Amino acid sequence: MKLSYLPSEFQKALPVLEKIKAAGFEAYFVGGSVRDALLNRPIHDVDIASSSYPEETKQIFERTVDIGIEHGTVLVLENGGEYEVTTFRTEDVYVDYRRPSSVSFVRSLEEDLKRRDFTVNAFALNENAEVIDKFNGLADLDNRVLRAVGKAEERFNEDALRIMRGLRFAASLDFDIEEKTFEAMTSHAFLLEKISIERSFIEFDKLLLAPHWKKGIKALLATKAYQYLPDFQETAEEWQSFVADYAEDFRFTSSEQAWAATLLALKHDNPRSFLKKWKTSVNFQKTVQSLIEIFRFRMEREVTKQDVYHYGKDLLKEAETLRQAQRLDVDYERIAELDGQLLIHDKHEIVVNGGKLMKELGFKPGPDLGRTLKAIENAIVDGKLANDEESIMAFVQAMKQV
């Protein structure tokens, strides 16, 4: 098969291919970028595979960086871009169900493509826009099927993370998982316990943000892979409710929103503790926790000025979007209106600080000063006190007389 044209992302990288070929080696575009070109999807990273060994690649180009030379990868800086050029290779026995014990460089493209995970990721593309398809990936692409390259059991036993990648591809591409591939994913799902939490997080996060995330969750449920992810041992009913709760075409707008929705559906009592186990950042944990808090109090009451001040309008709107996707009442206008009424959005905007109160009104550092500053802040947020020095000092004087 031949593409009708070579997309601009490949055209920009074409000089790299041409230089490698001029030096007497083979070179092709490979991986997800070729798949995405065939599906008319946006192309991101352009990867190149070559029969040239790393040292040979480095001799061809003036500017290179060793970014994974032990695995055959050299970063080539050419034509204003950065391109990973990886030597054709085969892989030895895998250790820890994730990494090969060693790699061997080879001169055969087919040997290199054999080690890929799925047939739709095992294409190569030459400089003439001709697609090399050794494993009937084009047929799978036409039929929207996700199929492992070769024996599925071997692929997942080599690298258990491919199970999560498969679920993610089903969600991002809207592909059905081929029967034998699905069976192998199910029978090898227990190996996910061997995979680092950080890598599992990346794949599950991409699944949640995919356009067809519901398909990915359904496959996660069907393969029972969720049972081998940290703290995801909920019942099938809770996972099914997660899918059912949201409108069919709803897409999450951020990772934080997606994880908040997940934890709400699964009824986790301690989101911060859960997210720590997934080794997420403190800021990520705080944002997810805040979204969950907002969603829960919105089931009981309206948004207040204090809510807008504490959480910020953007986070409130993000939580409101989850309500909208669940067909619940929303009030974006109220959030915007209250935000417009706020005299301050941060306590540092208050014109009187603790130093001034100590200097002019005799306050000492301690709980009394802290309570007074908090009272000032709350009164300004509630619109009961103007944010000017005269009003604030009078407010404090009145407090002291009570």
Swiss-Prot record:
Tell me which family the UniProt entry assigns to this protein: Belongs to the tRNA nucleotidyltransferase/poly(A) polymerase family. Bacterial CCA-adding enzyme type 3 subfamily.
Q: What else is known?
A: A single active site specifically recognizes both ATP and CTP and is responsible for their addition.
- The enzyme class is transferase
User: SUPFAM superfamilies per the record?
Assistant: Nucleotidyltransferase, Poly A polymerase C-terminal region-like
Q: What is the lineage of its organism?
A: Bacteria, Bacillati, Bacillota, Bacilli, Lactobacillales
Q: Where does CTP bind?
A: G32, R35, R116, D159, R162, R165, R168
Q: What name does the UniProt record give this protein? A: CCA-adding enzyme
Write out the catalysed reaction.
a tRNA precursor + 2 CTP + ATP = a tRNA with a 3' CCA end + 3 diphosphate; a tRNA with a 3' CCA end + 2 CTP + ATP = a tRNA with a 3' CCACCA end + 3 diphosphate
